[in-house]
C-alpha cells in the first residue's frame, strides 16, 4: 500500500468513525475499489490498527471528562456511595451502557462476520431513515447531566446494534440519544464517552491478534503508522467539528449521506463491481473493534 493510500484510509476512518455514517461500510467499499481485500491479512491488520488512532482521538479530546468521571466513580465507591454525585452516576451509567454491546459482541461475532455487502447497503438506508425520524420527532431538550440508568441501557442497546455492518456505532447511539429527547450535541457527547470502554477493550484484543500479521512487512508497517497518525489527528478535529455542528445544526446532511452511500453500494453490487456476499469477515463495527 502506498503512503498516499494509507493517509486516505486514515482520513476516511477519522471522518466515518465519528460522523453517523458507518466507518465499516466506507472502509470495506473503499478497500474493494482500490483492490484491497480482507482476504489479505496485511490489509485486515491495517484496517484494525488505524482504528486505534480514532480511539486515541477520543481519549485525548475527552481527557478531562474521562479523568473527572473515573475519579468521581472511584471516590464514590471508596466512600460507599457509588452514586453520590452526578459525575459518579454518569461514570457508572457508562459502564452499564457498555454491557449490551459487550454481551452481543461475545455471542454474535461469528454470525455477524458472515454478513455481506447487501446488509451494509440495507443498514445504511434503514438507519438513515431512523435518524431522519429522530431528527423530526425528538424534543432535543435533555442534556448529558440528565442521563439516567434507563437511558444508558437503551443507548447501550443501540450501541450493540452497531455490530451490524453499515449501521455505525456513532449513528446508532446518537440516534438513540435523540429519540430519548437529548439535544444533538448531548447525544453525540454521551455517544463518544460511551465508546471509550468498549473500544479500548475490543481494540486491545484486536491489536494483540493482528499486529503479528505485519511482521516482516516493512512497507505495510510504515503505511499502518501513517494511517494511524492521520486517523488520530483528523479524528480529533472531526470530533471538535461535529460537536460544534450539532450545537446549531441538524443531522439531515448525514441522513442524505447514508441514503446516498447505501444506494451507491447497492448499485455497485448490481453492476458486479462489489461482491454481494462477504468474502472475508468484516472488521467489527466501530463500537467493538476495532462506526460510527
Swiss-Prot record:
| Annotated catalysed reactions | di-trans,octa-cis-undecaprenyl diphosphate + H2O = di-trans,octa-cis-undecaprenyl phosphate + phosphate + H(+)
**Which Pfam families does the entry link to?**
BacA
The GO cellular component terms are:
plasma membrane
**GO molecular function annotation:** undecaprenyl-diphosphatase activity
Query: Principal localization?
Result: membrane
Q: Where in the cell is it found?
A: Cell inner membrane
Q: Which GO terms describe its biological process?
A: cell wall organization; peptidoglycan biosynthetic process; regulation of cell shape; response to antibiotic
Q: Top-level EC class, please?
A: hydrolase
Q: Which UniProt keywords apply?
A: Antibiotic resistance, Cell inner membrane, Cell membrane, Cell shape, Cell wall biogenesis/degradation, Hydrolase, Membrane, Peptidoglycan synthesis, Transmembrane, Transmembrane helix
Coiled coil ranges:
none
**Anything else of interest in the record?**
Bacitracin is thought to be involved in the inhibition of peptidoglycan synthesis by sequestering undecaprenyl diphosphate, thereby reducing the pool of lipid carrier available.
The record's listing under HAMAP family reads: Undec_diphosphatase
Membership in a protein family? Belongs to the UppP family.
What is the role of this chain? Answer: Catalyzes the dephosphorylation of undecaprenyl diphosphate (UPP). Confers resistance to bacitracin.
State the protein's name: Undecaprenyl-diphosphatase
